[in-house]
From Swiss-Prot:
EC numbers for this chain: 2.7.1.71
Positions annotated to bind ATP: 11-16, 116
Classification via InterPro entries: P-loop_NTPase, Shikimate/glucono_kinase, Shikimate_kinase/TSH1
Chain sites annotated for binding substrate: 33, 57, 78, 134
GO molecular function terms noted in the UniProt entry: ATP binding; magnesium ion binding; shikimate kinase activity
SUPFAM superfamilies in the cross-refs: P-loop containing nucleoside triphosphate hydrolases (SSF52540)
Positions bound to Mg(2+): 15
Keyword ATP-binding in annotation: yes
Gene name as annotated: aroK
Any GO CC annotation of this UniProt entry: cytosol
Keyword annotations: Amino-acid biosynthesis, Aromatic amino acid biosynthesis, ATP-binding, Cytoplasm, Kinase, Magnesium, Metal-binding, Nucleotide-binding, Transferase
Name of the protein this chain belongs to: Shikimate kinase
Statement: the UniProt record of this protein carries the keyword Amino-acid biosynthesis: yes
Annotated source species: Bacillus cytotoxicus (strain DSM 22905 / CIP 110041 / 391-98 / NVH 391-98)
């Protein structure tokens, strides 16, 4: 089975759905952000603070291309779609799934989460604007699922149905 790449904005449920799919399919799930943190020896928030977003995006591209492309689910960081080479890599090497969630619902979910470097709780409009900048990139995915107000099971079952059709 080709890799399943799960994309979407921060807080859309990529990690949660990736774990649920992993359990259903009996294959590993790899989180690109977690792998970057392991390789760099620090959390993403610190990479952004010390090296900036551009360096982080380079680490992200390198990590993406180093991961397996068979029998694996890869949950990506929300900004991985900003680079065309990343979008092309995922399309060529697997099935790309976009998890959409209303950005205002996400903002409510993330209000207290300090681990999100691009989320500024005092500026929800900037958060939504960043989502809109990326939206067309996300929508290049072959499978697009609205997770707003859906359970983990509903989303997982929908992905499985669409992958197997």
């Amino acid at each position: 089975m080709r890799a399943i790449y799960i994309t979407g904005y921060m807080g859309a449920g990529k990690t949660t759905i990736g774990k649920a799919l992993s359990k259903e399919l009996g294959i590993d799930v790899i989180d690109t952000d977690q792998k970057i943190e392991e390789k760099q020896g620090r959390v993403i928030r610190d990479i952004f603070a010390k090296e900036g977003e551009r360096s982080f995006r380079q680490y992200e591209s390198e990590m993406l291309c180093s991961l397996p492309t068979k029998d694996v689910i890869i949950t990506t960081g929300g900004g991985i779609v900003e680079r065309i080479e990343n979008r092309e890599w995922m399309k060529e090497n697997g099935t790309v799934v976009y998890l959409y969630c209303d950005p205002y619902v996400i903002a409510d979910r993330l209000h207290e989460d300090i681990t999100r470097p691009l989320f500024q709780k005092e500026n929800v409009e900037a958060f939504v604007a960043k989502f809109e900048e990326r939206r067309a990139f996300y929508e290049e995915a072959v499978i697009q699922i609205d997770t707003t107000n859906k359970s983990i099971q509903e989303v997982t079952e929908e992905i499985l149905r669409r992958i197997n059709s």
